[in-house]
């Protein structure tokens, strides 16, 4: 076989993104992929499912596992499940990206690091939000201190929001990939269904427009997702909360808040699906759903 007829070698691998809640893991994944796949908000615990983001460039395919934030507190069933998903993501991957926030180091960071000690894959420490560090001369001593805690393969200061050094991180990822066939077609950026992405978009808007009013005992169930004869997606979303007071928060005065949530969610869906969307939302009280493992299984939290 001549050189001209030979197919170029291809490389593929799995990358786990881990870290305590709210350090910017989802923002980093979205920046790498070039579009929003993982739900982002300023609240912790916004990522609940192991969303797989797929980035293919030339002969390289990196499959990213965006984990829920690891938690010390496991009093509720949903937190136990999120911890379990994050811990399982650490095993059987080619590279682990451990994301921390600036010069902060918390007990939660220490707990995540302790879980990584048993990992077989190399660990890259990504120090995120470095653009927010006011005293820049504190960064280098902080890096030195962290380097003594663990044998990191690399320590890289980044800003996921602004894209600073993300291209360097991607080069590190490429080097970790193994020679082998790609698992997904080149155009794929996620293995999640449109139905799942619709529920994530609605949940993101809930987080954004309820501010600190609404705790994490809220989820979204897509009851209908179909393409009608006019070529429009008809989507019905059921928002589950635990208390009547939370229902009132979501609906808002004269229904204004849920109207805003619906309008913003529909606009995002139309951009993502490249199609017209008719979205209807309802709010229902389902007491104790976040503590009920059967309810969590039916809502898709135990499909990992």
UniProtKB/Swiss-Prot annotation:
It comes from Actinobacillus pleuropneumoniae serotype 3 (strain JL03). This is GTPase Era. Keywords: Cell inner membrane, Cell membrane, Cytoplasm, GTP-binding, Membrane, Nucleotide-binding, Ribosome biogenesis, RNA-binding, rRNA-binding. Residues 128-131 are annotated as: G4. Residues 11-179 form the Era-type G domain. It is a peripheral membrane protein. Residues 45-49 are annotated as: G2. Belongs to the TRAFAC class TrmE-Era-EngA-EngB-Septin-like GTPase superfamily. Era GTPase family. Residues 210-287 form the KH type-2 domain. An essential GTPase that binds both GDP and GTP, with rapid nucleotide exchange. Plays a role in 16S rRNA processing and 30S ribosomal subunit biogenesis and possibly also in cell cycle regulation and energy metabolism.
């Amino acid at each position: 076989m001549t050189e001209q007829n030979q197919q170029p070698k291809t490389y593929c691998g799995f990358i786990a993104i881990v870290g305590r809640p709210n350090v910017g893991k989802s923002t980093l994944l979205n920046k790498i992929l070039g579009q929003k796949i993982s739900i982002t908000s300023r609240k912790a615990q916004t990522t609940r499912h192991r969303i797989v983001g797929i980035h293919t460039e030339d002969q390289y395919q990196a499959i990213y596992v965006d984990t829920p934030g690891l938690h010390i507190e496991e009093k509720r069933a949903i937190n136990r499940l999120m911890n379990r998903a994050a811990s399982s993501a650490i095993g059987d991957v080619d590279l682990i990206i451990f994301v921390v926030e600036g010069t902060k180091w918390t007990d939660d960071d220490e707990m995540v690091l302790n879980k990584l000690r048993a990992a077989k894959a190399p660990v890259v420490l990504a120090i995120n939000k470095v653009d927010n560090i006011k005293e820049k001369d504190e960064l280098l001593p902080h890096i030195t201190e962290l380097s003594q805690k663990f044998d990191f393969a690399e320590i890289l200061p980044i800003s996921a929001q602004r894209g600073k050094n993300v291209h360097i991180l991607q080069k590190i990822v490429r080097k970790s990939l193994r020679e082998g066939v790609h698992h997904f077609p080149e155009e794929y950026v996620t293995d999640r269904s449109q139905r799942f992405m619709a529920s994530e978009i609605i949940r993101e808007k809930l987080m954004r427009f309820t501010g600190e009013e609404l705790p994490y005992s809220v989820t979204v169930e897509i009851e209908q997702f179909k393409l009608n004869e006019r070529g429009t997606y008809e989507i019905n979303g059921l928002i589950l909360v635990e208390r009547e007071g939370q229902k009132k928060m979501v609906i808002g005065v004269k229904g204004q808040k849920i109207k805003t949530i619906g309008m913003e969610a529909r606009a995002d869906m139309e951009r993502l699906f490249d199609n017209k969307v008719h979205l209807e939302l309802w709010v229902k009280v389902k007491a104790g759903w976040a503590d009920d493992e059967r309810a969590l299984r039916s809502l898709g939290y135990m499909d990992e």
